[in-house]
């Protein structure tokens, strides 16, 4: 079967068979860097802590189109649950490319490389520049990957006008959805302090569960904002709630609650924090808050990049795309802080992070063509 593979699928095979479980890269970036260097890119390795990253650029003055992505994949889960071994990549009898990373996001990486190789061959003197920002730390803590590389680029005033992130944005058919923004993510660990005691003598103790419950209920019922044309209303979710010693006759001394905001551009970090504090204070709690901001919301309005991507999808697939800001966070949140227009465009996401991850193999060739046509519209 290998002899009949398209160039995009050949590269996808080579990437997927490498077990690059986050933050390990397993030579994926070395393969990509060799291909890019061969078509005139200046390649810069950026190993930060245990994370492999690289920045590559080709071209001169003018607008810069960046392709961004990650070579790391999530853990496989139980191997005996897979129809085929997760790194024993193949195209099955239904034409599906099977393997961990097929959708998220080694298929996109292969499409990017092959599209750029073709574009550079067809337009060796293209205007502006093409760049790549690739990391092995997207599926993990995401502290020493794109986030850290972006800070280095910022320090040296590197220009990034447009960025295509290869995250699997499509829902049912290739290109039916692109992400033109993402909600912000603000997490918090709340500790409510009480006083431990015997359940038979509640007047000698302070039960933090009883004390915290009304406040948590009010937080859960609060309407934080109404959203806008691009974002749904901000959501509040408690993800962990822990208290107690394990004994049935002991009132616990403290309660810990972990919660998360996915917030729109209608809310700010400071505003959400102030409102949480006001509600907790209203209930007279003795508490401590530890906040963790994962990323601010960002939005790419209709313009050069979104228009070029949408037109290319229409030309290649015949369908109109729908811009969306739904879903979780991505590395686009870091790149957007440079003032860059960011669009996420990749294959169907129906099986990402699942057992038996797969995508339609032919979709990767279509994706290659979409990336190619987008470059033609922006840089030819």
UniProtKB/Swiss-Prot annotation:
The keyword Zinc applies. Its EC number is 3.5.1.18. Binds 2 Zn(2+) or Co(2+) ions per subunit. Pathway: Amino-acid biosynthesis; L-lysine biosynthesis via DAP pathway; LL-2,6-diaminopimelate from (S)-tetrahydrodipicolinate (succinylase route): step 3/3. One of its GO terms (molecular function) is cobalt ion binding. It comes from the Bacteria. GO terms for biological process: diaminopimelate biosynthetic process; L-arginine biosynthetic process; lysine biosynthetic process via diaminopimelate. Gene3D superfamilies: 1.10.150.900, 3.30.70.360, Zn peptidases. Zn(2+) 1 binds at residues 70, 104, 167. Pfam families: M20_dimer, Peptidase_M20. Keywords: Amino-acid biosynthesis, Cobalt, Diaminopimelate biosynthesis, Hydrolase, Lysine biosynthesis, Metal-binding, Zinc. It is an enzyme of class 3 (hydrolase). The active site is at residues 72, 138. The keyword Membrane does not apply. Its cofactor is Zn(2+); Co(2+). Zn(2+) 2 binds at residues 104, 139, 353. Homodimer. PANTHER family: ACETYLORNITHINE DEACETYLASE (PTHR43808), N-ACETYL-L-CITRULLINE DEACETYLASE (PTHR43808:SF31). Catalyzes the hydrolysis of N-succinyl-L,L-diaminopimelic acid (SDAP), forming succinate and LL-2,6-diaminopimelate (DAP), an intermediate involved in the bacterial biosynthesis of lysine and meso-diaminopimelic acid, an essential component of bacterial cell walls. Belongs to the peptidase M20A family. DapE subfamily. This is Succinyl-diaminopimelate desuccinylase.
């Amino acid at each position: 079967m290998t002899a009949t593979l398209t160039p995009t699928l050949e590269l996808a095979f080579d990437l997927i068979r490498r077990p690059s479980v986050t933050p390990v890269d397993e030579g994926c970036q070395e393969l990509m860097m060799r291909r890019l260097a061969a078509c005139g890119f200046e390649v810069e390795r950026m190993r930060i802590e245990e994370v492999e990253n690289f920045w590559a650029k080709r071209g001169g003055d003018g607008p810069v189109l960046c392709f961004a992505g990650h070579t790391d994949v999530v853990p496989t889960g139980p191997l005996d649950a897979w129809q085929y071994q997760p790194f024993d990549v193949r195209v099955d009898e239904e034409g599906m490319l099977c393997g961990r990373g097929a959708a998220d996001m080694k298929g996109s990486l292969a499409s990017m490389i092959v599209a750029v190789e073709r574009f550079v061959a067809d337009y060796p003197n293209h205007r502006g520049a093409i760049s790549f920002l690739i990391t092995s730390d997207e599926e993990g803590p995401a502290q020493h990957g794109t986030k850290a590389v972006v800070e280095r680029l910022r320090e040296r005033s590197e220009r990034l006008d447009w960025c295509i992130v290869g995250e699997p944005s499509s829902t049912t058919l290739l290109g039916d959805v692109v992400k033109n923004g993402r909600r912000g993510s603000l997490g918090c660990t709340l500790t409510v302090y009480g006083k431990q005691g015997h359940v038979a003598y509640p007047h000698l103790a302070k039960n933090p569960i009883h004390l915290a419950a009304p406040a948590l209920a009010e937080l859960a019922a609060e309407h934080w904002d109404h959203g806008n044309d691009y974002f749904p209303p901000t959501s509040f979710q408690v993800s962990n709630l822990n208290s107690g010693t394990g004994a049935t006759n002991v009132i616990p001394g403290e309660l810990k609650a972990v919660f998360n905001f996915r917030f729109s551009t209608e809310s700010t970090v400071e505003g959400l924090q102030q409102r949480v504090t006001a509600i907790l204070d209203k209930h007279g709690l003795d508490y401590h808050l530890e906040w963790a901001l994962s990323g601010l919301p960002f939005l790419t309005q209709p313009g050069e990049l979104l228009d070029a991507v949408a037109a290319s999808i229409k030309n290649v697939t015949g369908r109109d795309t729908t811009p969306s800001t739904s879903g979780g966070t991505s590395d686009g949140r870091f790149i957007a802080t440079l003032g860059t227009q960011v669009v996420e465009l990749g294959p169907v996401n129906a099986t990402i992070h699942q057992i038996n991850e797969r995508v339609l193999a032919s979709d990767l060739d279509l994706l290659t063509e979409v990336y190619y046509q987008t470059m033609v519209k922006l840089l030819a």
